[in-house]
């Protein structure tokens, strides 16, 4: 899977960068987690700092346009993002599980 950055917009108030990207794939639309990991590797960030919001594939095409938010730290993502988006991206689940056990 090949990921190309279309645009980047800094958002210093929320300690993040908003990114539009395009990915080319051979099979079906890739999962949110695999796109997140590929995007994190391309940007040299930890995968917990990347939140994929949107993936849009046109019928019959092997290109997906997406929107992601890349935070400065994983804590910034936990503070700003809504719970359902964190669950979709599998961020913070281990931290919450540890807190519930204590």
Curated annotation (Swiss-Prot):
Does the keyword section mention Ribosomal protein?
A: yes
Q: Which InterPro entries match?
A: Nucleotide-bd_a/b_plait_sf, Ribosomal_eS24, Ribosomal_eS24_CS, Ribosomal_uL23/eL15/eS24_sf
| Keyword NADP included in the entry's annotation | no
One Gene Ontology biological process: translation
Q: Which keywords, in A-to-Z order, does the entry hold?
A: Ribonucleoprotein, Ribosomal protein
GO MF, one term, reads: structural constituent of ribosome
Query: Per the record, what is one GO cellular component?
Result: ribosome
Enumerate the PROSITE patterns for this protein. RIBOSOMAL_S24E (PS00529)
Alphabetized Pfam families for the sequence: Ribosomal_S24e
* HAMAP family noted in UniProt: Ribosomal_eS24 (MF_00545)
Protein name per Swiss-Prot or TrEMBL: Small ribosomal subunit protein eS24
Q: Which organism is it from?
A: Halorubrum lacusprofundi (strain ATCC 49239 / DSM 5036 / JCM 8891 / ACAM 34)
